[in-house]
Amino acid sequence: MNLLMLTFIICGLLTQVTKGSFEPQKCWKNNIGHCRRRCLDTERYILLCRNKLSCCISIIISHEYTRRPAFPVIHLEDITFDYSDVDSFTGSPVSMLNDLITFDTTKFGETITPETNTPETTMPPSETTSSKTTMPPSETATSETMPPPSQTALTHN
């Protein structure tokens, strides 16, 4: 009787082992791919499975797998805007400025003011610096008073 029970247990385990080893392994998300040595012509390689096998996913769309639902269609006629809170916005960050007139401050000469449309002449600022520049006398630094550059980064004075 014990021998008979042992053979039933072994046969039951053998069917489980053979079922897992002879069936092609599944891979990828929701087990839609198959692990193979070479992908078929209608399949695409995605990643590597165990034992140097490739995870091959079919290029042809199969309806047996659940797919992501399509995006809902938005009709432009259904979109409405409420303009009741919008004042007369000119596009300028500061209110009541006219964006059609720009002022160039880098050029000197004749500019037109937008209010009167009359030309005005402006002159560049006069140069107040002299041609001679004097430098204060600098102290001569010796190697005894100043440490080398590698040491100056380490000292905190």
Swiss-Prot record:
The keyword Acyltransferase does not apply. Residues 141-157 have a biased composition (Polar residues). Transmembrane segments: none annotated. One of its GO terms (biological process) is defense response to Gram-negative bacterium. Residues 109-157 are annotated as: Disordered. Keywords: Antibiotic, Antimicrobial, Defensin, Disulfide bond, Secreted, Signal. Gene3D superfamilies: Antimicrobial Peptide, Beta-defensin 2, Chain A. Has antibacterial activity. This is Beta-defensin 125. It comes from Pongo pygmaeus. The lineage of its organism: Eukaryota, Metazoa, Chordata, Craniata, Vertebrata.
